[in-house]
């Protein structure tokens, strides 16, 4: 008799995706982040669901309802901090996952890569609307500043902003719709993640060498299920260390002050995972130029397959490209630091130089260095 997992219509899908899936025998721990992102998403949906049971999306009671969750709801504090810090873990895994894709040339799987970029945008949108919900000072002013950027769009900008706000300022209507968006978007992310996996399983996984691995495949279970479980345990360890020892480490103290439209905080800044993009936005003195640079900083990922000039897929055997990649990582860390600093000398000029370097590396230097490496290898 044939095994039920191979014949049952539902179990067959799970079997082909997680059990009998042929996987390259040499994929490293950098390939763990896909499954970790899945775990993060499930964790965020579950904790978010329990928070939504007690949260009220009204400007008068939103801040109090979050306080009520932390003080009066059984284990509400741990659910709230797991959700807040879970978002940080989500973005750490996301950045490492994208970085892995860039380093090992995974962007040559066009459909998988493009769905991944759409996923990145969707997760960023979800995190942004979620940050507004506690209705603290940084929530309110973050929402005001970021939504106001759309007013830079010629002709329709102002109307668009007021349409998103549901009035002439960020108010009750804005909070209610942001809560609705924040509730629905994770399910859209889950659906997109399924499409992401579907396209990935059409081609099979890439591997560190960038060489086709059809000649040497092993079943996903038990080899990579065990490997993924180790990753999950480490993820949960780091998350719980953060939640139980310093839950507010990555948050902003201003968000413990209820939203006040009459009092602007001295330094408006987003959560740490948006600081690199925020620094690029601020480095351009023109409003529309800044918005275009902000969007381009993520959208540039879509161009990666077009900018790939090397005859090799992976950077594993390309030392010059490796150096450039790690300079790009250092540049992004610099931008993240600058995004959290006040707009004054010397931070302005450092931010501008780091922003120029970011686009220069991706759009100009990487393709040139790859071509030089081809010539050095007599290709």
Swiss-Prot record:
Residues engaged in binding a ubiquinone: 201
One of the GO biological process terms: mitochondrial electron transport, ubiquinol to cytochrome c
Single GO term (MF): metal ion binding
Membrane topology summary: Multi-pass membrane protein
Residues that bind heme b b562: 83, 182
Binding positions (heme b b566): 97, 196
Gene3D superfamilies in the cross-refs: Cytochrome Bc1 Complex, Chain C
SUPFAM superfamilies tied to this protein: a domain/subunit of cytochrome bc1 complex (Ubiquinol-cytochrome c reductase), Transmembrane di-heme cytochromes
Subcellular location: Mitochondrion inner membrane
Cofactor: heme b
UniProt keyword Electron transport, yes or no: yes
One of the Pfam families matching this protein, by short name: Cytochrom_B_C
InterPro entries per UniProt: Cyt_b/b6_C, Cyt_b/b6_C_sf, Cyt_b/b6_N, Cytb/b6-like_sf, Cytochrome_b, Cytochrome_b_C_euk/bac, Cytochrome_b_N_euk/bac, Di-haem_cyt_TM
CC per GO annotation: mitochondrial inner membrane; respiratory chain complex III
Cofactor note: Binds 2 heme b groups non-covalently.
Alphabetic keyword roster: Electron transport, Heme, Iron, Membrane, Metal-binding, Mitochondrion, Mitochondrion inner membrane, Respiratory chain, Transmembrane, Transmembrane helix, Transport, Ubiquinone
Residues annotated as transmembrane: 33-53, 77-98, 113-133, 178-198, 226-246, 288-308, 320-340, 347-367
Summary of the function given for this chain in its UniProt record: Component of the ubiquinol-cytochrome c reductase complex (complex III or cytochrome b-c1 complex) that is part of the mitochondrial respiratory chain. The b-c1 complex mediates electron transfer from ubiquinol to cytochrome c. Contributes to the generation of a proton gradient across the mitochondrial membrane that is then used for ATP synthesis.
Extra remark beyond the main annotation: Heme 1 (or BL or b562) is low-potential and absorbs at about 562 nm, and heme 2 (or BH or b566) is high-potential and absorbs at about 566 nm.
PANTHER family documented for this protein: CYTOCHROME B
Assembly and interaction partners: The cytochrome bc1 complex contains 11 subunits: 3 respiratory subunits (MT-CYB, CYC1 and UQCRFS1), 2 core proteins (UQCRC1 and UQCRC2) and 6 low-molecular weight proteins (UQCRH/QCR6, UQCRB/QCR7, UQCRQ/QCR8, UQCR10/QCR9, UQCR11/QCR10 and a cleavage product of UQCRFS1). This cytochrome bc1 complex then forms a dimer.
Family (UniProt): Belongs to the cytochrome b family.
This protein's name: Cytochrome b
Species whose genome carries this gene: Hydropotes inermis (Chinese water deer)
């Amino acid at each position: 008799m044939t095994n039920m997992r191979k014949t049952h219509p539902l179990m067959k899908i799970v079997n082909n995706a997680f059990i009998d899936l042929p996987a390259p025998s040499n994929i490293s721990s950098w390939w763990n982040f896909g499954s970790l992102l899945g775990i993060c998403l499930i964790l965020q949906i579950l904790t978010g669901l329990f928070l939504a049971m007690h949260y009220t999306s009204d400007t008068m009671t939103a801040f109090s309802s979050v306080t009520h969750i932390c003080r009066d709801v059984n284990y509400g504090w741990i659910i709230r901090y797991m959700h807040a810090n879970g978002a940080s873990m989500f973005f750490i895994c996301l950045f490492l996952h994208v970085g892995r894709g860039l380093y090992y040339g995974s962007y040559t799987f066009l459909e998988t890569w493009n769905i991944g970029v759409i996923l990145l945008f969707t997760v960023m949108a979800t995190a942004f609307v979620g940050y507004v919900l506690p209705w603290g000072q940084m929530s309110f002013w973050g929402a005001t500043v970021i939504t106001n950027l759309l007013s830079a769009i010629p002709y329709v900008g102002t109307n668009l902003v007021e349409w998103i706000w549901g009035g002439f300022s960020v108010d009750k209507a804005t909070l209610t719709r942001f809560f609705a968006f924040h509730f629905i978007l994770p399910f859209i992310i889950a659906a997109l993640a399924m499409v992401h996996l579907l396209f990935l399983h059409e081609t099979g996984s890439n591997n560190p060498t960038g060489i086709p691995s059809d000649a040497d495949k092993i079943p996903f279970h038990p080899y990579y299920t065990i490997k993924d479980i180790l990753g999950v345990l480490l993820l949960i360890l780091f998350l719980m260390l953060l939640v139980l020892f310093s839950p507010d480490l990555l948050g902003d103290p201003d968000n413990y002050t209820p939203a006040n439209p009459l009092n602007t905080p001295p330094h408006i800044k987003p959560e740490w995972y948006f600081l690199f993009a925020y620094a690029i936005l601020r480095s351009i003195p023109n409003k529309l130029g800044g918005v275009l640079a902000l969007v381009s900083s993520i959208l540039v990922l879509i161009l990666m397959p077009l900018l790939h000039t090397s005859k090799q897929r992976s950077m594993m055997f390309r030392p010059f490209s490796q150096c450039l990649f790690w300079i790009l990582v250092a540049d992004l860390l610099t931008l993240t630091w600058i995004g959290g600093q006040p707009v004054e000398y010397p931070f302005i000029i450092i931010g501008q130089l780091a922003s120029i370097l970011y686009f220069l590396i991706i759009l100009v230097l990487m393709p040139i260095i790859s071509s030089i490496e081809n010539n050095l290898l007599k290709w």
